[in-house]
Amino acid sequence: MSTKAIILHSGGLDSTVCLLLALEKGREVISLGIDYGQRSRAELEYALKLCKRFDVERKVLNIEWDKPKRVIPKSRSINEIGKEVSSAFLPGRNALFLVLACAEAAGIGASEVWTGINSIDYSGYPDCRPEFLEQFRKMINLAIPKGPEIIAPLISLSKPEIAKEAYRLGIRQGDTWSCYRPFNTNNGFVPCGECDACVLHKYAWEHIPKQTKVKSKMNKE
């Protein structure tokens, strides 16, 4: 009997790589999205398309969240992005999503929750750090005894390394969504190309490691 795993899946590069890694490892996968009124509705559409493509069950939790207003920076360089936490950062989002995923996992008998958080390169977000993950695991073990194991296979990978893994798994640059400020056109959503997410996405694909054989950093961190 295969292990049932919930994947926190936004439709972005990181979470989609997690989804495909879980499938590759033979997990019984459920893609879990969170509809919290995000301005980038395109990510929900992309996640659904990917689930249909890879024949994965998709579930979306709807929550009401009166989020703080944030300024989405644009046209920043890679170096600028890496210097400080972006004003686009939504405090507590990853913690909240992980709690919801763990609660969902406990309810359906899933023994794993996978998340695409990563701390290398330019994220800088406090809830993408190994220290956060370590403390969250301790907290959730108290809240849900014998609850799901939290798997974060990308925690020590750079963005280009994640893009390389995506390529290996059959994903190309336009298959996932990574934009905070999309344009809604008659032909669908179009990335702005200027926000931090777009800049990092482009950087990742343009700087994929050239080596054809590298030792994998994948783990169950």
Q: What are these model-predicted stretches?
A:
Residues 1-170, 216-218:
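ATP-dependent adenylation/nucleotidyltransferase module used to activate substrates
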Residues 204-213:
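Short cysteine/histidine-rich zinc-coordinating motifs and their immediately flanking basic loops
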Residues 99, 175-182, 186-203:
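Local cysteine-cluster metal-coordination motifs and their immediate loop/turn environment
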